[in-house]
Amino acid sequence: MTSLVVYSSQSGNTRKLAEAVFETLGGKKEIYPVADAPGAEGYDLVFVGFWLKAGKPDPESAEYLARVGNARLFLFATHGAASGSEHARNAMAAARTLTAGADIVGSFSCQGEVVPKMLEKARSKSQPPVWLADAPDAVGHPDENDMAALQRQIADLRLV
């Protein structure tokens, strides 16, 4: 099996998850930041990781997701919102809509620590984003437990 891991990371959170995915995979595998990533053609399984901007995948990842065609995908994301929150679920749903035709075999998301600059910007808005209230709980995430949960989920799917 040939696997591709593609990720976008502003603060390093999604990169940590991407590296955990990469460690889990057997067979032939490659890992790239989204800016350098090849297309999904020729890979048996593509893992795409992204951070959220305005409740959706970041722009670079959104563009990549729109180009994957009918590839087999596993989506993963980091965000300031609580894991399992409506914000997180809606963001993953938005990612799925970008991948029309793809076979999405799984998804995972967890909190990721929000960088101070982003927190400051969010607090200054006249209508603060919904995830801001959850941001204090995101400190230190993704942690070893988050990465282990992602790796278990991938192993349980028996994809690789």
Would you name each region that the model predicts?
Residues M1, E41, A102:
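Structured loop/turn residues at beta-strand edges in well-structured enzyme cores
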Residues T2-T24:
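N-terminal beta1-alpha1 ligand-phosphate binding loop
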Residues E23-E30, L45-V48, K53-V160:
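FMN-binding flavodoxin-like domain, especially the glycine-rich phosphate-binding loop
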Residues Y7, P38-A40, A66, T97:
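Generic structural signal for beta-strand residues in well-ordered domains
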